[in-house]
Amino acid sequence: VITDHNRYVCCPTTASVEPGPARSPRVGLVVAIGAISTGAILVRWSAAPAAVAAFYRVLFTTLPLAVVAIWRYRDAFGAIHRRDAIGAALAGLALAIHFASWFESLAWTSVAASVTLVQSQPLFVALGSWLFLRERLTRPIIGGILLAVGGVVVISVGDLLGGSVGSNPALGNALALIGALAAAGYVLAGRSLRQRVPLIPYVVVVYTVAAAGLLVIALLDGAPLLGYPTREWLLFAGLAVGPGLLGHTVINWALGHLNSSLVSVSLLGEPVGAAILAAVLLDEQPALATIVGGGIVLAGIVLTARGATG
């Protein structure tokens, strides 16, 4: 992830806030959130199996980064300790589970519900940090977690009462939550590793393992890897270039100019942007329970993020 409270680490960044005018970074941040918001729409447009779309999304994101890594960081790979390499591999497996489950969830539930629930990973990061890293849970964090759980309950009850979008909203929502849990595992696995391993080599190792994991999932599912029409290949490339490279590259650039808390909370614009795009491009109107519950979940995430950074 970009920071401990975001979903992905994909490109180099600086942790400090650099001086200079903030207008361009803020505009860039808005553009990046818009690019990330297209991810769910592109997955919905694709007719390929979820694991295949996820595999090519990760593969096409990894290839240009691998070129940079070989060109500038070749010696860094040999310096990675075996224990750190294993940790990076585990992070990659967690990332594979995240993409596979989230992409699959979009086949069963609404874009708004899926993206909102998968974005809840900061809550699981906070819980995991408390359970495994012995980090303290402050009152804002606890309150944010409870608030977000309440939002999930609202969405789930709305699904049970009917009126929700999707052929099996309960399954789709559960898969999205699994995606959030896996993303949290990815963040927690990488938190300590990033203090010792340079970013680009770390990302290349993680994404290579993630691509391999998704390839295995696709093969076990019996999904074809080739033979797709040009439209599908364009969608695969769009997933890598838009949400993968453009979105997160610009976010990492913005992190060098803006406060990390602002960037972290701004990522909550993804569910809003995705829901708007789904309404316009897919004619998908989220159910009232999804809107209300999603708002509660997002409020809980904001409270948790502020408690973790305050």
Annotate each language-model stretch with its function.
Residues 34, 38, 62-81, 149-169, ...:
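Membrane-interface helix-cap regions at the ends of transmembrane helices
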Residues 60-64, 117-131, 209-213, 265-281, ...:
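Alpha-helical transmembrane segments of compact multi-pass small-molecule transporters, enriched
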Residues 1-56, 60-64, 150, 162-192, ...:
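Glycine-/small-residue-enriched transmembrane alpha-helix faces in small-molecule transporters
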Residues 46, 53, 57, 105, ...:
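Hydrophobic/aromatic residues within transmembrane alpha-helices
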Residues 34-38, 42, 68, 89-108, ...:
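Hydrophobic alpha-helical transmembrane segments of multi-pass membrane transport proteins
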Residues 2, 89, 128-129, 137-160, ...:
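Hydrophobic transmembrane alpha-helices of multi-pass small-molecule transport proteins
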Residues 48-97, 122-124, 181-186, 204-221, ...:
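Transmembrane alpha-helices of multi-pass small-molecule transport proteins
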Residues 22-25, 47-55, 80-85, 142-145, ...:
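Juxtamembrane helix-entry segments on the extracytoplasmic side of multipass membrane proteins
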